[in-house]
Swiss-Prot record:
Keywords: Cell membrane, GTP-binding, Lipoprotein, Membrane, Nucleotide-binding, Prenylation. Belongs to the small GTPase superfamily. Rab family. A lipid is attached at C202, C203 (S-geranylgeranyl cysteine). This is Ras-related protein RabQ. GO terms for biological process: phagocytosis; vesicle-mediated transport. It is found in: Cell membrane. A motif (Effector region) lies at residues 34-42.
């Protein structure tokens, strides 16, 4: 069985549910009282994709402006970036272009990026339509998912989807696999690996 170690960055504005998304995927847990991420936090989980074992090293980055200079260092060497927004907050969606530019500038050229519209359990508070999210993703040529970290809706689909995309790029020869370690997969030009929120009835 082939085994790949992939580095995944979860990024985007603050309070859109990045930490909750990661907690659900790695621990199958959800909490209405999540501590605000300070800098960068890290978890791992292994999954099986098309008879290949994928070990995901997932970095949860703080969305606050004061941590941006720290968190952007962790984009280097990443194979996957999940760019998250809150479907109930228009401002989080409007800020996406800046975050997208940051990911593309600080990451390798062929990094797999997915746009994640979180909190889709809050249907009565939705202000960003599915069509808007899909259009944004299409214009930027990236993947698109809507999730609920609270209800676990489509959480697995996100990580399965981005992992399958990476594997397809490896098979196409776009990514060169030298060995099994995270820094062994080169996406375009070689890069070096750089070493409480308010309560809500919706997911955080």
């Amino acid at each position: 069985m082939e085994e790949y170690h992939l580095k995944c960055i979860v990024t985007g504005p603050p309070f859109v549910g990045k930490s909750s998304l990661l907690l659900q995927f790695c621990e199958k847990e959800f909490s209405f009282e999540m501590d605000t991420t300070i800098g960068v936090e890290f978890q791992t989980r292994s999954i099986l994709i098309d008879s290949s074992k994928i070990k995901l090293e997932i970095w949860d980055t703080a969305g606050q402006e004061s941590f941006r200079s720290i968190t952007t260092n962790y984009y280097r060497g990443a194979h996957i970036a999940l760019l998250c927004y809150d479907i109930t907050k228009r401002q989080s969606f409007q800020y996406l272009s800046g975050w997208m530019d940051e990911v593309r500038q600080m990451s390798s050229p062929n990094i797999v990026i997915a746009l994640i519209g979180n909190k889709c359990d809050c249907k009565d508070k939705r202000v960003i339509t599915t069509e808007e999210g899909a259009k944004n993703a299409k214009e930027n040529d990236i993947l698109f998912f809507e999730t609920s970290a609270k209800d676990y809706e489509s959480v697995e689909s996100v990580f399965d989807g981005v992992s399958k995309k990476v594997l397809s790029l490896i098979k196409q020869g776009t990514l060169t696999v030298v060995n099994k370690k995270p820094q062994s997969i080169q996406l375009g030009a070689p890069t070096q690996e750089t070493p409480k929120k308010p309560k809500s009835e919706c997911c955080k």
